UniProtKB/Swiss-Prot annotation:
Gene giving rise to this polypeptide: msrA
UniProt organism field: Enterobacter sp. (strain 638)
Taxon lineage: Bacteria, Pseudomonadati, Pseudomonadota, Gammaproteobacteria, Enterobacterales
Biological function: Has an important function as a repair enzyme for proteins that have been inactivated by oxidation. Catalyzes the reversible oxidation-reduction of methionine sulfoxide in proteins to methionine.
BP-aspect Gene Ontology terms: cellular response to oxidative stress; protein modification process
Similarity comment: family membership: Belongs to the MsrA Met sulfoxide reductase family.
Protein name as annotated: Peptide methionine sulfoxide reductase MsrA
Amino acid sequence: MSLFDKKQLVSQADALPGRNTPMPVATLHAVNNHSMTNVPDGMEIALFAMGCFWGVERLFWQLPGVYSTAAGYTGGYTPNPTYREVCSGETGHAEAVRIVYDPSVTRYEQLLQVFWENHDPAQGMQQGNDHGTQYRSAIYPLTPEQDAAARASLARFQDAMQAAGDHRTVTTEIANATPFYYAEDDHQQYLHKNPYGYCGIGGIGICLPPQLA
Protein backbone atom coordinates (compact mmCIF):
# COMPACT_ATOMS: atom_id res chain seq x y z
CA MET A 1 0.00 0.00 0.00
CA SER A 2 1.13 3.55 -0.63
CA LEU A 3 1.63 6.12 2.13
CA PHE A 4 -1.65 7.72 1.08
CA ASP A 5 -3.51 4.43 1.37
CA LYS A 6 -1.97 3.79 4.78
CA LYS A 7 -3.69 6.94 6.04
CA GLN A 8 -7.11 5.63 5.01
CA LEU A 9 -8.79 3.10 7.30
CA VAL A 10 -9.17 -0.28 5.64
CA SER A 11 -12.64 -1.81 5.39
CA GLN A 12 -13.46 -5.05 7.15
CA ALA A 13 -13.89 -6.74 3.78
CA ASP A 14 -10.38 -5.72 2.70
CA ALA A 15 -8.59 -6.39 6.00
CA LEU A 16 -5.96 -9.10 6.29
CA PRO A 17 -7.30 -12.48 7.50
CA GLY A 18 -4.92 -12.86 10.43
CA ARG A 19 -4.71 -16.14 12.33
CA ASN A 20 -6.30 -18.11 15.15
CA THR A 21 -3.14 -18.43 17.25
CA PRO A 22 -2.52 -15.62 19.78
CA MET A 23 0.88 -13.99 20.02
CA PRO A 24 2.99 -15.55 22.80
CA VAL A 25 3.27 -13.13 25.72
CA ALA A 26 5.72 -13.09 28.62
CA THR A 27 4.32 -14.20 31.95
CA LEU A 28 5.67 -11.21 33.89
CA HIS A 29 6.01 -7.49 33.22
CA ALA A 30 9.68 -6.63 32.64
CA VAL A 31 9.54 -3.55 34.89
CA ASN A 32 7.53 -4.59 37.94
CA ASN A 33 7.27 -8.40 37.64
CA HIS A 34 3.47 -8.32 37.81
CA SER A 35 1.36 -10.61 35.65
CA MET A 36 1.03 -9.47 32.04
CA THR A 37 -2.41 -11.03 31.63
CA ASN A 38 -4.20 -11.36 34.97
CA VAL A 39 -6.43 -8.63 36.38
CA PRO A 40 -6.46 -8.77 40.19
CA ASP A 41 -9.74 -8.29 42.03
CA GLY A 42 -10.71 -4.64 42.36
CA MET A 43 -8.60 -3.49 39.43
CA GLU A 44 -9.82 -2.14 36.11
CA ILE A 45 -8.58 -1.97 32.52
CA ALA A 46 -8.10 1.07 30.28
CA LEU A 47 -7.18 1.10 26.58
CA PHE A 48 -5.52 4.08 24.90
CA ALA A 49 -3.89 4.72 21.52
CA MET A 50 -1.75 7.83 21.12
CA GLY A 51 1.00 7.04 18.64
CA CYS A 52 3.95 4.67 18.90
CA PHE A 53 3.17 2.33 21.78
CA TRP A 54 6.75 2.19 23.05
CA GLY A 55 6.63 5.64 24.62
CA VAL A 56 2.96 5.40 25.53
CA GLU A 57 3.49 2.25 27.57
CA ARG A 58 6.31 3.87 29.54
CA LEU A 59 4.14 6.88 30.38
CA PHE A 60 1.57 4.67 32.05
CA TRP A 61 3.76 2.10 33.81
CA GLN A 62 5.33 5.00 35.74
CA LEU A 63 2.02 6.07 37.28
CA PRO A 64 1.07 5.17 40.85
CA GLY A 65 -1.68 2.57 41.02
CA VAL A 66 -0.84 1.02 37.65
CA TYR A 67 -0.44 -2.73 38.10
CA SER A 68 0.65 -3.63 34.57
CA THR A 69 0.84 -2.34 31.02
CA ALA A 70 1.03 -4.08 27.67
CA ALA A 71 1.65 -2.96 24.10
CA GLY A 72 -0.74 -4.31 21.52
CA TYR A 73 -3.23 -3.77 18.76
CA THR A 74 -6.94 -2.98 18.86
CA GLY A 75 -9.70 -1.10 17.08
CA GLY A 76 -9.43 -3.05 13.84
CA TYR A 77 -10.45 -6.31 12.22
CA THR A 78 -7.52 -8.70 11.77
CA PRO A 79 -7.30 -11.34 14.53
CA ASN A 80 -3.90 -11.85 16.18
CA PRO A 81 -2.01 -9.54 13.81
CA THR A 82 1.75 -9.14 13.59
CA TYR A 83 3.55 -5.82 13.90
CA ARG A 84 4.39 -5.93 10.21
CA GLU A 85 0.75 -6.48 9.31
CA VAL A 86 -0.41 -3.60 11.50
CA CYS A 87 2.20 -1.31 9.93
CA SER A 88 0.88 -2.22 6.48
CA GLY A 89 -2.35 -0.40 7.30
CA GLU A 90 -4.34 -3.46 6.26
CA THR A 91 -5.60 -4.58 9.68
CA GLY A 92 -7.50 -1.49 10.83
CA HIS A 93 -5.79 -1.69 14.21
CA ALA A 94 -4.18 1.11 16.20
CA GLU A 95 -1.04 0.65 18.26
CA ALA A 96 -2.48 0.72 21.77
CA VAL A 97 -1.61 0.16 25.41
CA ARG A 98 -3.63 -1.94 27.85
CA ILE A 99 -3.42 -0.57 31.39
CA VAL A 100 -4.45 -2.53 34.47
CA TYR A 101 -4.85 -0.09 37.33
CA ASP A 102 -6.19 0.28 40.85
CA PRO A 103 -8.99 2.89 40.73
CA SER A 104 -8.65 3.51 44.46
CA VAL A 105 -5.15 4.88 43.76
CA THR A 106 -5.42 6.34 40.27
CA ARG A 107 -8.81 7.24 38.81
CA TYR A 108 -9.72 6.83 35.15
CA GLU A 109 -9.98 10.61 34.95
CA GLN A 110 -6.29 10.83 35.87
CA LEU A 111 -5.40 8.37 33.11
CA LEU A 112 -7.35 10.56 30.70
CA GLN A 113 -5.30 13.56 31.78
CA VAL A 114 -2.08 11.70 30.94
CA PHE A 115 -3.60 10.70 27.61
CA TRP A 116 -4.61 14.21 26.51
CA GLU A 117 -1.53 16.03 27.76
CA ASN A 118 1.11 13.74 26.24
CA HIS A 119 0.30 13.58 22.53
CA ASP A 120 -1.25 15.67 19.76
CA PRO A 121 -4.88 14.56 19.39
CA ALA A 122 -5.54 16.66 16.30
CA GLN A 123 -3.25 15.02 13.76
CA GLY A 124 -5.59 12.45 12.26
CA MET A 125 -3.85 9.34 10.99
CA GLN A 126 -0.41 10.19 12.33
CA GLN A 127 1.50 11.22 15.42
CA GLY A 128 4.47 13.45 14.76
CA ASN A 129 6.67 11.84 12.14
CA ASP A 130 4.84 8.51 12.44
CA HIS A 131 2.29 8.26 9.64
CA GLY A 132 -0.44 5.67 9.21
CA THR A 133 -3.77 4.61 10.66
CA GLN A 134 -2.00 2.59 13.35
CA TYR A 135 -0.77 5.85 14.92
CA ARG A 136 -4.19 7.45 15.30
CA SER A 137 -5.38 8.89 18.61
CA ALA A 138 -8.08 6.75 20.20
CA ILE A 139 -9.79 5.86 23.46
CA TYR A 140 -11.50 2.49 23.73
CA PRO A 141 -13.83 2.51 26.75
CA LEU A 142 -14.73 -0.78 28.39
CA THR A 143 -17.67 0.49 30.44
CA PRO A 144 -20.41 3.11 30.04
CA GLU A 145 -18.73 5.12 32.79
CA GLN A 146 -15.42 5.16 30.91
CA ASP A 147 -17.24 6.14 27.72
CA ALA A 148 -18.97 9.08 29.40
CA ALA A 149 -15.74 10.24 31.04
CA ALA A 150 -13.81 9.96 27.76
CA ARG A 151 -16.36 11.98 25.79
CA ALA A 152 -16.60 14.65 28.47
CA SER A 153 -12.81 14.94 28.58
CA LEU A 154 -12.63 15.32 24.80
CA ALA A 155 -15.05 18.24 24.95
CA ARG A 156 -13.03 19.89 27.71
CA PHE A 157 -9.75 19.43 25.87
CA GLN A 158 -11.23 20.78 22.64
CA ASP A 159 -12.41 23.87 24.52
CA ALA A 160 -8.95 24.26 26.09
CA MET A 161 -7.33 24.11 22.65
CA GLN A 162 -9.66 26.80 21.34
CA ALA A 163 -8.97 28.99 24.38
CA ALA A 164 -5.23 28.60 23.77
CA GLY A 165 -5.56 29.67 20.14
CA ASP A 166 -5.28 26.19 18.63
CA HIS A 167 -8.34 26.00 16.40
CA ARG A 168 -7.78 22.52 15.03
CA THR A 169 -10.44 19.87 15.59
CA VAL A 170 -9.63 16.96 17.88
CA THR A 171 -9.57 13.79 15.78
CA THR A 172 -9.43 11.30 18.65
CA GLU A 173 -11.57 8.24 18.01
CA ILE A 174 -13.77 7.12 20.91
CA ALA A 175 -15.23 3.69 20.24
CA ASN A 176 -16.28 0.67 22.26
CA ALA A 177 -13.37 -1.62 23.01
CA THR A 178 -12.79 -4.49 20.61
CA PRO A 179 -10.44 -7.43 21.28
CA PHE A 180 -6.96 -6.38 22.37
CA TYR A 181 -4.16 -8.41 20.80
CA TYR A 182 -0.79 -8.45 22.53
CA ALA A 183 2.16 -7.27 20.45
CA GLU A 184 5.27 -9.38 20.03
CA ASP A 185 7.47 -9.66 23.12
CA ASP A 186 10.12 -7.40 21.55
CA HIS A 187 7.64 -4.53 21.85
CA GLN A 188 6.63 -5.14 25.47
CA GLN A 189 8.23 -2.63 27.86
CA TYR A 190 10.46 -1.66 24.94
CA LEU A 191 11.92 1.47 26.50
CA HIS A 192 12.85 -0.44 29.64
CA LYS A 193 14.75 -2.98 27.57
CA ASN A 194 16.11 -0.25 25.25
CA PRO A 195 16.46 2.92 27.39
CA TYR A 196 17.75 5.00 24.49
CA GLY A 197 15.14 3.76 22.03
CA TYR A 198 12.71 5.85 20.01
CA CYS A 199 9.83 7.43 21.91
CA GLY A 200 8.07 9.68 19.40
CA ILE A 201 5.33 11.18 21.55
CA GLY A 202 4.87 14.62 23.07
CA GLY A 203 2.09 16.94 24.13
CA ILE A 204 1.00 20.27 22.67
CA GLY A 205 1.43 22.26 25.89
CA ILE A 206 -2.25 22.33 26.79
CA CYS A 207 -3.63 20.93 30.05
CA LEU A 208 -6.89 19.06 30.42
CA PRO A 209 -9.23 21.27 32.46
CA PRO A 210 -10.49 19.56 35.61
CA GLN A 211 -13.87 17.92 35.64
CA LEU A 212 -16.52 20.15 37.18
CA ALA A 213 -18.29 18.73 40.21
